[in-house]
Amino acid sequence: MMNSSQFSDSQTTSLHRIPTFYCCYLLQSINKKQSFYIGSTPNPVRRLRQHNGNLSNGGAYRTKREGTRPWEMVLVVYGFTSKIAALQFEHAWQHGYKTHYIPMDDRIMKNANSGRTVHHKLGLVRQLLANVYFRHMNLKVHFFSMPILDVWNLNKFNIKMGSNEISVDVSQVSQETKTNLEQASDDDDDNGACSRDERNLQLVTELYDNTVTKENEIKEIIKDILVLGERNCNLCGQCYDYTSEDDTMKMHIFICPNSTCHYEAHLNCLYEKFIEEESGIDSKNILLPNFCMCPGCLDEMSWSDFVKISTMIKNSFSN
């Protein structure tokens, strides 16, 4: 994550933008239950189709092995602040026995040949999410399979998350029936497996499309405010103007997307406010805010949410 000093508005270099969607995912073979695959992608719909051979290009050698197709995407971890961060999580997830993100004494995988069960796969996710590096990204875990969610809730290795609250969700269709994706697996014919594969793709598509749609809606809300011209930071009062030809007026700002709020302030001002508030509670030196609320509507948001909206504004509307 970035801190206040990294949001210099005099920068002329290419600006980093937090991706709309970037995830790490876990695949499970429908026909071979003990076969799993871990990967990462900015587009889980396209990637799942590649793994299942629906697209001619892409996929992975391991997911092409005889008898393993079709695959279903049983969970995704998403909300990464960059492609690099997602790749780091993916590599650590694949190599839990040696990753520096998990202390050696706490590792549930002891060597390269261990940790092949789904309990280990999900246990590693818990351990990685507890690491301070990933914790500040406010990552979310989304399940497309109720049995896999049940394994998560079982928490076989009793992994403690500390005070870190992880956003865990499950596709709505899965909530309506615990056998939504599993019913077809009771049938031994190919049609049953195919039906389950297609249903899973629908669930993945819904999550991805909803995330993209939500960001586009936020863009439109913010655009309607920015076109009004000169605006003022609600904290320091300094002007900014995204309609100006003067790039120095196009500072890193945050605008609350809440339809009843639209609080606006410089990202630096918000950073200083949140750090000061948390420093008053905890005497330790704090580099990144942990608990943030929009000063206008008091909606709880993570610091990464503030940064994501601010960098989206800077990248989308500064030209």
Swiss-Prot record:
Subunit structure comment from the entry: Forms a heterodimer with SLX4.
HAMAP family for this protein: Endonuc_su_Slx1
Family in the record: Belongs to the SLX1 family.
Cellular compartments per GO CC: Slx1-Slx4 complex
Protein task: Catalytic subunit of the SLX1-SLX4 structure-specific endonuclease that resolves DNA secondary structures generated during DNA repair and recombination. Has endonuclease activity towards branched DNA substrates, introducing single-strand cuts in duplex DNA close to junctions with ss-DNA.
Residue stretches making up the GIY-YIG domain: 20-103
Gene3D superfamilies recorded: GIY-YIG endonuclease, Zinc/RING finger domain, C3HC4 (zinc finger)
Keywords, in A-Z order: DNA damage, DNA recombination, DNA repair, Endonuclease, Hydrolase, Metal-binding, Nuclease, Nucleus, Zinc, Zinc-finger
Protein name as annotated: Structure-specific endonuclease subunit SLX1
Subcellular localization, as worded in the UniProt entry: Nucleus
EC numbers for this chain: 3.1.-.-
